[in-house]
């Protein structure tokens, strides 16, 4: 009989002990996100969550997203602390625009070789995002897959479920001529347009860690976490009759605002109502990007656009600004049968 070397899972590149060490590292921060509806703790085959009792006809709203190639920039710069916030933001902001309160969140973290410090940093960010949005982090999957990813490169995906009263779903159907559009300021490019961002960095030859913009490194502007609007928007919805909300993600103004507009309406955006944050001016100049392309690839300083009746506008602005948002009137809704659903003038 020929002697054979005894192989283990670790020999194949999967370190179960590292995975267990990660779970031990994150238990504390995950526990802080717990909601009263969550049943049980980490470690079950599935996470259990009851519906809040205040809903008469609860409708579940679900969403999933990632952070795109912002992740590549974060890995290149070895800055992982905000990626988790981005991940949660991209999911919960999509839920709240339909009037939904986020209930619970799950994450998927995949890598070629698990680095416990990096993964813990990302998941700490996820927990922070859940705290900011009032959402429970109920579970996740950490997949160490040698040969699937280069070295310690990783990818993340998030999954979120929220709930809304059936009669209070916001779907844009009540948007009408004369409605006022209110903008909520963004914290930067959020998590969209980063393939173009990275191309601009490459073509311009700049070093984002040493290139300064408004007194701080370009990298700080680009890796600023996506703003989470959940608590401000839920309070707005509770006090104001909101007709529609658009989350400005991939596709920018041109593609996201029309998603919440009824037929025969047009959003007219007043470009002079705000000044682009410096990072967008830099991207446009460094990349020689056209105005139209800027509004398609980036949010240009606007994270959400909210439609409501004109008499409610001032009250809404006061509430949002009191909650810490940078909110302003950005435009109006006009009746139009034009194929151009958004006009920026």
From Swiss-Prot:
Key words of the record: ATP-binding, Cytoplasm, Ligase, Nucleotide-binding, Purine biosynthesis
A GO MF label: phosphoribosylamine-glycine ligase activity
Gene3D superfamilies: PurM-like C-terminal domain (3.90.650.10), PurM-like, N-terminal domain (3.30.1330.10)
Coarse class of the protein's main subcellular location: cytoplasm
Pfam families membership: AIRS, AIRS_C
GO annotation terms (biological process): 'de novo' IMP biosynthetic process; adenine biosynthetic process
Pathway(s) where this gene product acts: Purine metabolism; IMP biosynthesis via de novo pathway; 5-amino-1-(5-phospho-D-ribosyl)imidazole from N(2)-formyl-N(1)-(5-phospho-D-ribosyl)glycinamide: step 2/2
InterPro entries per the UniProt record, alphabetical: PurM-like_C_dom, PurM-like_C_sf, PurM-like_N, PurM-like_N_sf, PurM_cligase
Subcellular location(s) per record: Cytoplasm
Chemical reaction(s) catalysed: 2-formamido-N(1)-(5-O-phospho-beta-D-ribosyl)acetamidine + ATP = 5-amino-1-(5-phospho-beta-D-ribosyl)imidazole + ADP + phosphate + H(+)
EC number: 6.3.3.1
A GO CC term attached to the entry: cytosol
Membership in a protein family: Belongs to the AIR synthase family.
Protein name as it appears in the record: Phosphoribosylformylglycinamidine cyclo-ligase
Source organism per UniProt: Salmonella typhi
Designated gene of the protein: purM
């Amino acid at each position: 009989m020929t002697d054979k070397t005894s192989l283990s899972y670790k020999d194949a590149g999967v370190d179960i002990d590292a995975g267990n060490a990660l779970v031990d590292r994150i238990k504390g921060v995950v526990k802080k996100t717990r909601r009263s509806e969550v049943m049980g703790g980490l470690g079950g085959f599935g996470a259990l969550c009851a519906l809040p009792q205040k809903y008469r006809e609860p409708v579940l709203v679900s969403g999933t997203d990632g952070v795109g190639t912002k992740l590549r920039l974060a890995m290149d710069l070895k800055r992982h602390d905000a990626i988790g916030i981005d991940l949660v933001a991209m999911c919960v902001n999509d839920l709240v625009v339909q009037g939904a309160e986020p209930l619970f969140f799950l994450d998927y973290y995949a890598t070629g070789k698990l680095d416990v410090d990096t993964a813990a940093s990302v998941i700490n960010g996820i927990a922070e995002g859940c705290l900011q949005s009032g959402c429970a982090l109920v579970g996740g999957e950490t997949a160490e897959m040698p040969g699937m990813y280069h070295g310690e490169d990783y990818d993340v995906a998030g999954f979120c479920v929220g709930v809304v009263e059936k009669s209070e779903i916001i779907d844009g159907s009540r948007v009408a001529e004369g409605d006022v559009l209110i903008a909520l300021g963004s914290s930067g490019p959020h998590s969209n347009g980063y393939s173009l961002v990275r191309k601009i960095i490459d073509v311009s030859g700049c070093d984002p860690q040493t290139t300064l913009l408004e007194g701080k490194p370009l990298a700080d502007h680009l890796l600023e976490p996506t703003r989470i609007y959940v608590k401000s928007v839920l309070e707005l919805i509770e006090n104001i009759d909101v007709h529609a909300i658009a989350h400005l993600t991939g596709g920018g103004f041109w593609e996201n605002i029309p998603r919440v507009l009824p037929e025969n309406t047009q959003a007219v955006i007043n470009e002079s109502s705000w000044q682009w944050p410096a990072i967008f001016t830099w991207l446009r100049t460094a990349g020689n990007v056209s105005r139209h392309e800027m509004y398609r690839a980036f949010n240009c300083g606007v994270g959400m656009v909210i439609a409501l009746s004109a008499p409610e506008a001032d009250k809404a602005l006061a509430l949002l600004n009191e909650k810490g948002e940078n909110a302003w009137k950005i435009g109006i809704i006009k009746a139009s049968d034009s194929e151009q659903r958004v006009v920026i003038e």
